[in-house]
């Protein structure tokens, strides 16, 4: 039986974010996801989940400054420490909210950085995130995003995913 989660970043946008939890429950959803929880405390969000009988399904690792067009940090060699701090923050939220998966946005390929450096950074960051999340009982998930919706997005097709070294390879 398929299960659907309401994406509160995309649905019920006529309401304030915290009011969207009730709107999702009223529409019959049992689970929710959204881009980022970090503008609110985990306690505020947990209260909305509990009050509305909802399960937190997924959210993203911090992805840089979304308002300025950033769409992830995983492929940025000059932002590794920020990426790692984001993994720690996401785990702290997930431990309160109860979700068992977190999505990592690869990011827009940085200009002026060679392919090998970008790929090595990306794979090392994925390995770091996968190891930390697994230790916390959380699954790391990824999504490809086409370059029409996000020009320059690094992980933009499955061919790249299959030809890149696995984060689990030694």
Indicate where each model-derived feature is located.
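Alpha-helix N-cap and loop-to-helix initiation/capping positions
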Residues: 74-85, 113-124, 152-160
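Generic enzyme active-site microenvironment
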Residues: 31, 141-142
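Short, small-residue-enriched loops and turns at beta-alpha junctions
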Residues: 12-13, 109-111, 147-154
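N-terminal pre-domain/capping segments
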Residues: 1-99, 127, 134
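Single conserved hydrophobic/aromatic residue that forms the stacking wall/gate
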Residues: 162-170
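Conserved beta-strand edge residues that scaffold enzyme active sites
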Residues: 38-39, 63, 108-109, 147-148
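Active-site groove signature of glycoside hydrolases
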Residues: 94-113, 142-147
